């Protein structure tokens, strides 16, 4: 549920998460839920967003709906980028590393306490990188004091399993599987810990950890649906795929586009639909 201090219905913004579920998150639906908490973010003093397969923000114009939806979209889409490239000496990560070392090659249930280690690590990464993440999402600096995941819950338990015949990592709603290892070094432990952390939060919600890019998108990426302001919808056709990609090229130190990244992603998506539609008429 998303609660904003808005009484008047004016504009609506939403995001679709990939889920094989109903909208209630029951037995056939989401196997996990968590809340994104922000404080002193742009014009928003405090807000909590609990994930669901379809999230709609409804309220007054300029009440902060797009800010909240954009930050949620950004964590789901760009969250993998905040994990360190080298083993960290931070206390939160070292606790995850120690836990995993104790359970190498042993089928182990992820208890509430174990899961909390990984949520704490992810929150520390969010805290230290929140300004850079927000700038990447919005294409300009936005004030943010707190950004973290709270109220993590699961409908079903999950465990770590090891397979001597496996050659790759894999995940389902019930287990995270790794190939058996003789003696994992710190780099291998980091890769496994990042995989565990990401999937505890994002399995079935965002794109999997290892997902190829097909036609510019990763399977499972959330879709941001901006408010349907007429002027915006009339201009999208003028924005072509190449110009958007150039504007947000990772090689450019300062992005030249004035659009936020969720809007660019949405425009690229509907541009592809437009191209496919034209091709089908030929």
Regions found by a protein language model. Give the residues of each.
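Aromatic- and Gly/Pro-rich amphipathic surface segment
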Residues: 253-271
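ABC-family P-loop ATPase nucleotide-binding domains
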Residues: 268, 273-282
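P-loop NTPase switch/coupling surface
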Residues: 1-259
